[in-house]
């Protein structure tokens, strides 16, 4: 079997400049590639399930950049051997140049950017609870945290509508701890999505500071879709009007709202509490 590992020793190597450039959205768009940094994140990417009733995003890794000097564990080589693609080995100083992290662990995978629009034709069934819709999210770290929380709370599907950010921004991947690859996450049209779920018997709840109903007052054992809006502007009028009810979280201080990711977490874990009663 030919040796797939190539050694890079110069900062000026074109491959170094190319992979470092994928930190920028314009380069990701042009190359139709994005990078996945970290052992945990890459591990989840290569084990993502695209054959479930609601498939996860497909991940096709095309190259791997490694620096054994930065490895933090004992399983890195096994992971490297499981990925069938060209491998580029770099010294620590060069790897740190391309890394997105303060303390890199020596692993960056480059993957093809998948089509992230909802694949309605590939969804075998929609019978999961709850479902989460995020409208107009602006901060990559917030979206990543929401995905991590949603996966932990047993959410069956996340749809991002009218996103202000790139779904494959390195901060989204990092803050999600790789759950962007193990949880079905897609981009969709708000009206189409809400109409689709209404036809499937879902209750649609818009969570907003001025919501009429306290979030703990509804029956979350029923098939539920929860809508959350952007950090700055909240939910659009369309989102509120197309929902069956509007929910609010109690605010006892001077602040008028909570962080978007925290609000999602509170509602989703109330859903767990009710479903487990």
Residue ranges and their predicted role:
Residues 80-110:
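Glycine/small-residue-rich loop that forms an oxyanion/phosphate-binding "nest" at active or ligand-binding sites
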Residues 47, 82, 88, 93, ...:
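RNA substrate-binding interface of SAM-dependent RNA methyltransferases
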Residues 38, 138-146, 259-263:
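Amphipathic alpha-helical repeat scaffolds
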Residues 8, 34, 135-136, 161-162, ...:
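Glycine- and other small-residue-rich loops at beta-strand/loop junctions that grip anionic moieties
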């Amino acid at each position: 079997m030919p040796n797939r590992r190539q050694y890079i020793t110069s900062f000026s190597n074109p491959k170094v400049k190319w992979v470092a450039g994928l930190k920028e959205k314009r380069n990701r768009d042009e190359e139709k590639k994005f990078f996945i940094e970290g052992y945990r994140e890459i591990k989840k990417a290569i084990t993502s399930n695209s054959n479930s009733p609601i498939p996860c995003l497909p991940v096709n890794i095309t190259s791997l950049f490694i620096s054994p000097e930065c490895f933090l564990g004992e399983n890195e080589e096994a992971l490297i051997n499981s990925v069938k693609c060209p491998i580029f080995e770099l010294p620590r100083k060069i790897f740190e140049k391309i890394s997105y992290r303060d303390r890199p662990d020596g692993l960056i995978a480059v993957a093809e950017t998948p089509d992230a629009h909802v694949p309605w034709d590939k969804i075998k069934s929609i019978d999961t609870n709850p479902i989460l819709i995020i409208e107009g999210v602006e901060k990559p770290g917030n979206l990543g945290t929401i995905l991590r929380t949603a996966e932990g709370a047993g959410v069956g599907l996340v749809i991002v509508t009218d996103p202000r950010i790139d779904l494959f921004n390195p901060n989204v991947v990092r803050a999600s701890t790789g759950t962007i690859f193990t949880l079905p996450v897609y981009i969709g049209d708000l009206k189409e999505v809400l109409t689709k779920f209404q036809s499937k018997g879902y209750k649609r709840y818009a969570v907003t500071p001025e919501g009429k109903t306290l979030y703990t007052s509804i029956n979350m054992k029923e098939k539920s879709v929860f809508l959350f809006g952007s950090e700055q502007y909240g939910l659009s009028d369309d989102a509120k009007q197309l929902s069956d009810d509007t929910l609010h979280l109690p605010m006892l201080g001077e602040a008028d709202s909570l962080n978007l990711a925290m609000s999602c977490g509170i509602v989703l874990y109330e859903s767990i509490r009710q479903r487990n009663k």
